[in-house]
C-alpha cells in the first residue's frame, strides 16, 4: 500500500465518512487493540517471561488453564474496565459476567472475548490469538447476564488478533473486513489489507481427522468425498490443514480460502458442539460472512442462533460459501 494508515486513522475515517463507528465504539476498539499489543509482547517473551505452562486451575468449561490464559484475561479486563465505553464484559475464562465497577463510568457496550484461543499450542510456539465481539447493552438500569444473550447478527464489531510470525489484527464493524499488522518499531497497527474476500470455492479443508469415527453421517460423507479427490464425486483433489487454533485456521481461510469444520460428535452427545457460540463462533462467523463466506451449524446460520446461556456451545462450519452450503445440504438430506 502506498500510504501507511494506522488503526486509529482507519477508525477515525470510518467514523467521519461512513458513519459505521460511533465515537465510543471507536475508542473501545482502540483499547482492545492496545490490550492485544500487550498480550502479544507477553506471548513473545515465552519461557523468558515465565509465562509458559499450566496454571493448575480449570475454567468454567472444565478445561485446564494455561498461565497465559489467565494473564490475557486480566490484561483485557484491566485495559477496558476504566475507559467509560463498557457496561460489562464476559470471557470464556470466567464463570459469569464482569460488571464495570462503580468507581468507573459505565458505557453502552458489552465486550465478549476468548482471551487466548488455541492455548494448547502455547508451549510449542504455534500461532494463537485473541477473539472479541461487541454488542450494545439493551436499555434498562444495571447489567444482567441476560443482556449478553443476543444473536450474533446484533454484533456491532468483531475481530481477532493472531500472534504468529507477525501480530495481525482482523476487524469488522459491518462494512467488510480489514487487516492490520503490528509495526513493532512504531508500536502501531498498520492497515495491510482492506475488503478481504473468501473465495466461494476451495480445495482445502480444516478439520481434526482423529475425531472422524465420532462424527455424524453428513460430516463423514462430506470429508469422505473430499478425500476421494479427482476420482470421487467432487472431481478435484483437496488438501487438509489443521493447526488446532481456531484463530490460525480461520485466518488462513480468510486470506486464501478454505472451509473450517468443528462438528458435533458422539463423545458428548448432549452438547451441540465444542466451540463457544458467544466468544468464538459468533465473531468468526460475522467476519467470514463480511468477507463473502458463510457460517453454519449444519442446520442453521450461526448468526441467527438465539443464545440460551453465556457459555453455550455450537457446531461450526465456516469458510468458502459453496462448501458450507454443501455441508448444510448434506445435513438436510440426512
Curated annotation (Swiss-Prot):
It is found in: Cytoplasm. CDD domains: FBPase (cd00354). It catalyses: beta-D-fructose 1,6-bisphosphate + H2O = beta-D-fructose 6-phosphate + phosphate. GO terms for molecular function: fructose 1,6-bisphosphate 1-phosphatase activity; magnesium ion binding. Substrate binds at residues 117-120, 208, 274. Pathway: Carbohydrate biosynthesis; gluconeogenesis. Its EC number is 3.1.3.11. Pfam families: FBPase (PF00316), FBPase_C (PF18913). Mg(2+) 2 binds at residues 114, 117, 280. InterPro entries: FBPase_C_dom (IPR044015), FBPase_class-1 (IPR000146), FBPase_N (IPR033391), FBPtase (IPR028343). GO terms for cellular component: cytosol. Gene3D superfamilies: 3.40.190.80, Fructose-1,6-Bisphosphatase, subunit A, domain 1 (3.30.540.10). Mg(2+) 1 binds at residues 92, 114, 116. Keywords: Carbohydrate metabolism, Cytoplasm, Hydrolase, Magnesium, Metal-binding. Binds 2 magnesium ions per subunit. One of its GO terms (biological process) is gluconeogenesis. Its cofactor is Mg(2+). The keyword Amino-acid biosynthesis does not apply. Homotetramer. Belongs to the FBPase class 1 family. PANTHER family: FRUCTOSE-1,6-BISPHOSPHATASE-RELATED, SEDOHEPTULOSE-1,7-BISPHOSPHATASE, CHLOROPLASTIC. This is Fructose-1,6-bisphosphatase class 1 2. It comes from Albidiferax ferrireducens (strain ATCC BAA-621 / DSM 15236 / T118) (Rhodoferax ferrireducens).
Amino acid at each position: 500500500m502506498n500510504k501507511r494508515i494506522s488503526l486509529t486513522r482507519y477508525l477515525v475515517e470510518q467514523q467521519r465518512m461512513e458513519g459505521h463507528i460511533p465515537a465510543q465504539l471507536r475508542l473501545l476498539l482502540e483499547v482492545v487493540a492496545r490490550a492485544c499489543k500487550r498480550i502479544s509482547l507477553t506471548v513473545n517473551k515465552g519461557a523468558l517471561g515465565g509465562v509458559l505452562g499450566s496454571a493448575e486451575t480449570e475454567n468454567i468449561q472444565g478445561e485446564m488453564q494455561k498461565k497465559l490464559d489467565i494473564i490475557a484475561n486480566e490484561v483485557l479486563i484491566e485495559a477496558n474496565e476504566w475507559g467509560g465505553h463498557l457496561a460489562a464484559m464476559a470471557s470464556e475464562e470466567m464463570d459469569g459476567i464482569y460488571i464495570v465497577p462503580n468507581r468507573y463510568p459505565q458505557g453502552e457496550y458489552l465486550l465478549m472475548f476468548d482471551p487466548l484461543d488455541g492455548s494448547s499450542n502455547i508451549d510449542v510456539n504455534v500461532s494463537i490469538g485473541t477473539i472479541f465481539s461487541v454488542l450494545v447493552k439493551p436499555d434498562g438500569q444495571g447489567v444482567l447476564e441476560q443482556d449478553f444473550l443476543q444473536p450474533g447478527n446484533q454484533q456491532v464489531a468483531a475481530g481477532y488478533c493472531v500472534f504468529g510470525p507477525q501480530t495481525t489484527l482482523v476487524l469488522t464493524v459491518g462494512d467488510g473486513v480489514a487487516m492490520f499488522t503490528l509495526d513493532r518499531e512504531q508500536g502501531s497497527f498498520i492497515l495491510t489489507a482492506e475488503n478481504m474476500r473468501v473465495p466461494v470455492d476451495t480445495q482445502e479443508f480444516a478439520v481434526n481427522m482423529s475425531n472422524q469415527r465420532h462424527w455424524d453421517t453428513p460430516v463423514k460423507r462430506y470429508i469422505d468425498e473430499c478425500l476421494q479427490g479427482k476420482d470421487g464425486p467432487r472431481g478435484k483433489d483437496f488438501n487438509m490443514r489443521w493447526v488446532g487454533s481456531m484463530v490460525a485456521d480461520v485466518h488462513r481461510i480468510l486470506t486464501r480460502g478454505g472451509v473450517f469444520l468443528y462438528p458435533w460428535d458422539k463423545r458428548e452427545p448432549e452438547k451441540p458442539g465444542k466451540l463457544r457460540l458467544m466468544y468464538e463462533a459468533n465473531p468468526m462467523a460475522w467476519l467470514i460472512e463480511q468477507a463473502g463466506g458463510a457460517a453454519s451449524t449444519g442446520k442453521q446460520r450461526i448468526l441467527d442462533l438465539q443464545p440460551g446461556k453465556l457459555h453455550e456451545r455450537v457446531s461450526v462450519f465456516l469458510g468458502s460459501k459453496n462448501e458450507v452450503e454443501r455441508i448444510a445440504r448434506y445435513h438436510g438430506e440426512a
